[in-house]
């Protein structure tokens, strides 16, 4: 038996783990006290990761769809040769607009992204669709306007805040904050601190709160606007901070002062006394921060919500300070900056949608495939994603994917999307390869965890860097690795820390500019084989995939040399980044990469004047338009995608991992159930404009009347059986989304629920 250090892959926290491995199986999973961020924390979901690693639907070898619709086993050589031929032919006949990529690695599979994006370059395409773009792109767009770059990302210093305002999030189940349950417990126990939760359901986090504002679903924008109006009208805004660091407050102030405060509070259906208490406490606190999540990012007014929640900490000056909201450093670039005003980014053919942070929204993908125009999407690569179940309107995805000329899926399991593919390519799991995540969101101390492989892969499963490098070679895009670079990488003494190779590699790309887009694979084939960490166990699987991290470490050290040195790394202007890279490579528990000081947070602002630009005309218009928005209250509103104790993302396919709620019950207020003749455990039919689902009812008096909830992470077929629980996106509509970012309104889906016996038969 061996004990291996790795990390959880279920949410963006990526907590460190120690896993006992015996005979190729996980025998015990516990938190890793040596992890620089999580420090031993473990939740119940991570403790069941053996069900991800060992389940029966693992892909064993490449598959090709036959004319009869079945799959046949093929070799890697045949699969990649045929794919190379098809991709070249598609590019030559239809150009780059005919090709798109969907994926990005989920919550912990990000290292392959440097390699998969090269395929887009080879295909002359920029169309990247990602789950992030059905969750967070409205937030990224707001960041670009406020701070000057869509990559400027905000975190929250909850551990040191006197007042914590959580809006549309349930960290007790969803995590998203450091060591969530410990942090919530500490907040609750401290009488000098105040926890406020805004949520239409009395969640586990809301039960721990000092104040729970149980808003009517979809009215968060009205509540946040009311809080801001109160702060301004009572002159609680931080004039000193606004004068020193912001511009455009005058236009915002004018809008807030004329806002119909009482009407907005009534629209949210909360008590004015509670709103006043929260506004005053937040504004007057020594330190305060805001934490938000999908509850407002996938609800009505999504992009406006992202603007208003940031205004709460900006207007009060709780930004760039201990216990406030702050920027953070980053190593792995998972986002881009694609401001549509620059005029250089490609809109989609049908919706004329521009990318946000380099990403296009999944909500429009079926339409872009079915578009009758010549430049519609004809071929799609799906990597580590299952959009058939996770994208809005499953029926639309199934219909659109059936019309593709080429659908290729790279995954560890035979997903619902893979079942529709022309080729299915087996990837190694996240514990069978070198891997990492780009969700390094901490401030002032930030860390990066390069996870070492702790198990050998299945015989024909390959890591994504190898898959995409081989494909580029088969397409003729990537020449054989230059012998001189390979020799230099092998010969260069360790004391020069690869700097000679870096200089030679840069010179090679300068002379061969066509190959610059393929730098990751070139480093993989040249420097990669020479990366041999001292840790013997990891040496059995090549660390070549980590080679591009050298360039990223050098860049970070150039941008933030003092922060890198404070994190414990030693070196001069030339060697500091190489020293950081070596630490990343050698430390299986993860390593600190930067240690900032709070007053440095403002340095991340990218506007030329170094100020926060509060006036965003498009969003001020949306804010003003709330006054005239008609109040429409559906019979029932479905919250699609509730976080529960035993649901996670799509990588948990084996239903045996769940200790409770095996059917993914529909939660409903007892009075709503009684009005429909339903009791706990009854079967019912939940119907929306797009479809119907049979569900099991569970009574929950923590819900507001008029709302029901279903969990995400269900509906997968296991070992060829029926769907395990609800396929919730049979109920969601692609057009029911934010008008700016096209993020879906999953948390506000109008539905009807009826006792199954009284329902019309399903078609």
Report the location of each language-model feature.
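N-terminal export/assembly segments and adjacent metallocofactor-ligating motifs
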Residues: 1-234, 258, 263, 271-272, ...
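Acidic/polar loop patches that form or flank catalytic/metal-binding clefts of enzymes
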Residues: 27, 238-239, 275, 289-290, ...
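N-terminal leader/propeptide and maturation segments of large enzyme subunits in energy/redox metabolism
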Residues: 67-72, 234-272, 454-602, 660-662, ...
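Extended redox/cofactor-interaction regions of prokaryotic respiratory oxidoreductases
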Residues: 114-188, 193-196, 221-225, 310-419, ...
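Short beta-alpha connecting loops at secondary-structure transitions
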Residues: 207-215, 432-437, 446-457
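Active-site phosphate/pyrophosphate-binding segments
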Residues: 227, 245-364
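Catalytic, metal-anchored helix/loop core of enzyme active sites in primary metabolism
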Residues: 422
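Long, contiguous, secondary-structure-rich segments that constitute the structural scaffold
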Residues: 464-517, 521-522, 654-667, 671-763
